[in-house]
A protein has these predicted regions:
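N-terminal helix-turn-helix DNA-binding core of bacterial DNA-binding proteins
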Residues: 2-44
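Beta-hairpin "wing" of winged helix-turn-helix
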Residues: 55-69, 74
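Accessory beta->alpha helical hairpin/"wing" motif in late/C-terminal subdomains of nucleic-acid enzymes
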Residues: 75-80
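Amphipathic alpha-helical dimerization/coiled-coil segments
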Residues: 84-107
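A general structural signal marking secondary-structure boundaries and capping sites
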Residues: 22, 56, 101-104
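Short, hydrophobic-biased segments on the C-terminal half of alpha helices
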Residues: 46-51
Length: 107
């Protein structure tokens, strides 16, 4: 299975959070939104954002806010495709785990 509960899950959560804002969103807000579903430090999250940008799943732009620049992250078409793959993988994964917990899968 491609989907695991480590890096891929965090990538999926970040892409889902960023995809909610059509014009993109900034790092601190992404951190807060991700923390609403999974505990994560900024020192963990920013390398994920940089990697997703390097992988062309996210693009960035800077905009002035309160006298300083704020970096915004926006999902790309490649990022949307990756997010859709993660959604399918998550559905398969969570269905199997639910069946296992309910006793419906023979080991």
């Amino acid at each position: 299975m491609v989907f695991n509960t480590g890096a891929a899950l965090l990538d999926a959560i970040v892409l889902a959070v960023v995809s909610k804002e059509e014009e993109g969103t900034y790092g601190y807000k992404i951190t807060q939104d991700v923390r609403s579903v999974r505990e994560v430090s900024e020192s963990t999250l920013y390398p994920v954002l940089r990697r997703l940008q390097k992988d062309e799943c996210l693009e960035t732009y800077d905009m002035a806010y309160a006298g300083r620049n704020r970096r915004y992250y926006k999902i790309t078409e490649k990022g949307k495709a990756q997010l859709n793959l993660y959604r399918v993988e998550w559905k398969n994964y969570s269905t199997k785990i639910s069946k296992l917990f309910e006793g419906g899968i023979e080991l």
